[in-house]
Amino acid sequence: MGLSISFLSIIMMMCLLFPDLNVVVKSATTEYTTLIYKGCARQQFSDPSGLYSQALSAMFGSLVSQSTKTRFYKTTTGTSTTTITGLFQCRGDLSNHDCYNCVSRLPVLSDKLCGKTIASRVQLSGCYLLYEVSGFSQISGMEMLFKTCGKNNIAGTGFEERRDTAFGVMQNGVVSGHGFYATTYESVYVLGQCEGDVGDTDCSGCVKNALEKAQVECGSSISGQIYLHKCFIAYSYYPNGVPRRSSSSSSSSSSSSSGSSNSDPSTSTGATGKTVAIIVGGAAGVGFLVICLLFAKNLMRKKHDDY
């Protein structure tokens, strides 16, 4: 009976010592795993033999596996009658570890949000995945898939001039950055990225198109995101200055993501969360070790008393 009470006490002690550990760890990933949008084909694929499901599962496995090594990967799987092409891409400032954490969520989300459709695209804040069954109708790389604009507007303050200058800097930056660029100009943070297999010239054209859409669609809104089929851009204005953050991105290069990345206001909370998670996790490990030693000591004492 004493042993059971001791074990229960240990469990209660762990709950009291680390009640927010799970919350802290989650906060470290939410900045790149938030769902932005989904795109699902209306047609479900007919799969009486299960070949499509097998091909899709194999493709998902391949994409998730590659996300530990690179931020962009495209593959084709299946047979001549069940060909499926799929790809993933992570935001250019994510480390390989964060890229994997982001991409590994996408297969389940795709199945949950779209089911067994002949084409699917799921975009999170840090990565996206898409697949198409052979023969699916193609769309223009300039096609707008999704947009979101901030609710606050600041017309007449010189914001639009600063934003447009930042846009110009970013358009040039994605070329020198070979598909990814992020920077800050006079309190305006901008980020642009093209799909990994898009050349520099086409990338510049796609980003230019997205920036023009942002000017029209979002007007004087202090923030906005425009997602085209082959690229996306995002911007945020901070009147009091863009918050600083410590860099958590990997320095390793990838086929799709390189170039400059300055302070990203959208990830400042996430970077802090990671740091806190590491500290709290370390403390939890030490605390758990101490508790295990105490438990072992009590166990040995009980055995000694029994004799």
UniProtKB/Swiss-Prot annotation:
PROSITE patterns registered for this protein in UniProt: GNK2 (PS51473)
All ranges on the Extracellular side of the membrane: 24-275
Tissue distribution: Highly expressed in inflorescence shoot apex. Uniformly expressed within the inflorescence meristem with the exception of a boundary zone between floral primordia and the meristem where the expression is weaker (at protein level).
Main location: membrane
Ranges for domain Gnk2-homologous: 33-136, 141-240
Subcellular location: Cell membrane; Cell junction, Plasmodesma
Residue ranges, annotated region (Necessary and sufficient for plasmodesmal targeting): 276-296
Disulfide partners: 40-114, 90-99, 102-127, 149-218, 194-203, 206-231
Membrane topology: Single-pass type I membrane protein
InterPro entries (alphabetical): Cell2Cell_Antifungal, GNK2, GNK2_sf
Superkingdom as given in the UniProt entry: Eukaryota
Segments on the Cytoplasmic side according to the record's topology features: 297-307
Residue spans crossing the bilayer: 276-296
Any one Gene Ontology BP term: transport of virus in multicellular host
One of the record's GO cellular component terms: plasma membrane
Signal sequence segment: 1-23
Region (Disordered): 246-270
Assembly and binders: (Microbial infection) Interacts with Grapevine fanleaf virus (GFLV) 2B-MP.
PANTHER family on file: ANTIFUNGAL PROTEIN GINKBILOBIN-2-LIKE, PLASMODESMATA-LOCATED PROTEIN 2
Function: Modulates cell-to-cell trafficking.
Record-stated family: Belongs to the cysteine-rich repeat secretory protein family. Plasmodesmata-located proteins (PDLD) subfamily.
Protein name: Plasmodesmata-located protein 2
Species per Swiss-Prot/TrEMBL record: Arabidopsis thaliana (Mouse-ear cress)
Lineage, highest ranks first: Eukaryota, Viridiplantae, Streptophyta, Embryophyta, Tracheophyta
